[in-house]
A protein has these predicted regions:
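Short, charged, low-hydrophobicity "junction" segments
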Residues: 1-9, 106-109, 132-135
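A short, N-terminal "cap"/entry segment at the start of jelly-roll beta-barrel domains
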Residues: 1-23, 140, 166-168
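N-terminal regulatory/effector-sensing and dimerization cores
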Residues: 10-12, 19, 26-116
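Hydrophobic packing within well-folded, soluble alpha/beta domains
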Residues: 51, 70-73, 159, 184, ...
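Short, locally clustered residues in the helix-turn-helix/winged-helix DNA-binding domain
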Residues: 55, 164, 189, 193
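Amphipathic alpha-helical segments enriched in hydrophobic/aromatic residues interleaved with Lys/Arg
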Residues: 109-175, 186
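DNA-binding recognition helix and immediately preceding turn/loop
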Residues: 174-197
Length: 197
């Protein structure tokens, strides 16, 4: 199994931090090579939020006791203290990136980017940019000297890309040019950064 991950604090404990609007606690990726399956079951969930991006293959998730197979190009969102049950199978060739985050303004930040807390699975597309962003966040979580502003910028970029792709998937194309989308991303990053200062 291939694992690459970075942690802001202790990797064995989740945490809740309301001292700033958004804090990334950890980020990583899993890819099965020989292990037949990798199950995760958190009956009480975690204290933070989690996004999982299925970059390749498919994964099996359970929401409200029902199995849902999630294919490449989708992100899954878990809220704090929500039951988490999912399994990666070798035969499905899964490559999954994940990020755990917390903060005093997470709900508003997600809402600003059009990400509903009432849903779990969102289409966002299979883009190499996502892998690049996640890998950079992993690296930055591993190097505390990099600071949090860069990580916040990358999270904001992920949220903006997610919002754009999910809007298109809902048959509601965003009424924004590329320059307006970039301006929205910059505004979002500035807002998060200012609130963190």
């Amino acid at each position: 199994m291939y694992i690459n991950s970075g942690y802001l604090n202790n990797p064995r404990t989740d945490f809740k931090d309301n001292s700033t609007p958004l804090v990334v606690g950890s980020c990583g990726t899993y890819r099965l090579k020989t292990r037949p399956k990798l199950p995760t079951y958190r009956q009480k969930g975690r204290r933070d939020y989690q996004i999982l991006y299925v970059a390749n293959g498919k994964t099996h998730f359970w929401f409200d006791g029902r199995e849902e197979i999630v294919s490449a190009g989708h992100m899954v969102l878990y809220k704090p203290e929500e039951i988490q049950k999912y399994v990666y199978y070798l035969e499905d060739n899964p490559e999954v990136f994940w990020i755990h985050f917390t903060g005093s303004d997470v709900k508003n930040i997600l809402a600003y980017h059009g990400i509903s807390l009432d849903e779990h699975v969102f289409y966002c597309g299979v883009l190499p940019d996502y892998k690049v962003l996640f890998r950079k966040i992993i690296q930055e979580c591993s190097c505390a000297a990099m600071g949090t502003r860069t990580i916040l910028h990358r999270c904001s970029t992920i949220f903006c890309c997610w919002w754009t792709a999910s809007s298109v998937n809902r048959k509601k194309p965003p009424a924004m040019s590329k320059s307006k989308l970039n301006a929205r991303r910059l505004t979002s990053t500035r807002t998060i950064t200012q609130r963190s200062a």
